[in-house]
Amino acid sequence: MSRESSRLEDYLRRIHSLSRKNPVHAADLARDLGVSRATVCVFIKQLQEEDYVSVGEHHIITLTPKGAQIAENTCQRLDTVRRLLESLGVPGEIAARDALEIERGLSPQSYEAFHRFNDRNREKAWDLR
C-alpha cells in the first residue's frame, strides 16, 4: 500500500471512529492524529475534492458514502488481523497496535485467508500463551 493510500485510510478511519461519539472538527482530528490543525485542514481539503468527506455548517467533517465505505473496509480488515493475533495469544493492546502495521501491507489474498481462518476457528478457544 502506498504511503498516501495509508494516510487516506488513517484519516478516514479516524473520522469514522471519532464521529461515533461527537461531531468531528479539524482540531479533534489533529489531536487524535498527533499533527497540526493546518496539516489536517490541507488534507481535508484534498479529501473534499476527491469526495471522501464533506465539511458542513460549523466546520463539521463528515464522511461521504465513498469515504465511509473505505473507512468501514479498513476497520473490518484491522479487526480481522487483530482477532487473528489475539487468537494466537497476543494481548489485546499489542494486537491492536500490530494490526495497524500488518494491515497496511496485507494482500487481498492474505486478508481473505486470515478472514477464513478466523471464521473456521471462531468457536475454538485458542490460548497459546
Report the location of each language-model feature.
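C-terminal regulatory/oligomerization modules of transcriptional regulators
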Residues: R97-R129
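Key DNA-contact positions within bacterial/archaeal DNA-binding proteins
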Residues: A38, E93
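Basic, amphipathic "hinge/linker" alpha-helix immediately C-terminal to the N-terminal HTH DNA-binding motif
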Residues: H59-R77
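N-terminal helix-turn-helix DNA-binding core of bacterial DNA-binding proteins
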Residues: S2-V35
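Alpha-helical residues within the helix-turn-helix
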Residues: R31, Q48-E49
